[in-house]
Amino acid sequence: ISLARYYKELEKIPWKRETESAGIEFLSEAEMKVLLAQPDTATKKGIRDLLLMIMLYDTGARIQELLNLRICDIQFSKSPTVKVLGKGSKYRFIPVMPKTMEHIRKYMKLYHPGEGNYANAFLFYTDRKGVRAPMSDDNVRKMLRHYADSARASCPSMPTNLHPHHFRHSRAMHLYQHGMDLALVSQWLGHANLETTLIYAHADTEMKRKAIEKASAGICEIDAGESNPDTLDDDTLKRLYGLR
């Protein structure tokens, strides 16, 4: 399928509120800040829950990728990264922000005391009668719903069906809105096909408008009859959307 035809098909999708545009559900940066303020960090559980949400957002990892993360998959260095095993059994290395590393170290002191940075233990786990077990997807979803309900008191727009993928979509959209090239966003998300990531470009209407204005500035002298959007070739469309 050509990009020209692809974008014509996208234009048929009706616009909805921001968090539902083009099938993507994501939080605004303000909503994310309210959500991350909900855990009680004076408690051990609150420290764990906050780290889990921060890592879902900072890494953009899928929930199972994060729950499968082991301590030895974290690079504790001046340029910290986490190694996640994604779809197709492919590893990718994701940069982690210094503030996130501070939360990881704080969490490690409480949940992994005495364990070194190369331990093979799962980073997140549940303790049942002294026996550790990997944390389940269901546990995370229940936890997120709890904090979403709490956040809704001061942020009515908080989704009622908050789920782990909201964090992945939100981080990708925020990076794109702040100027990250869509090709880099695609690599960061671990998408095998760049077209999968194009949905973020379609969802952000304001950035799309600015990109079109910028691309049109140099051709304003061309007669209207010489320019037809339906005949733009794939390479031109890719440059228009920041893919070249």
Predicted regions and their residues:
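Conserved catalytic core of the tyrosine transesterase superfamily
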Residues: I1-R244
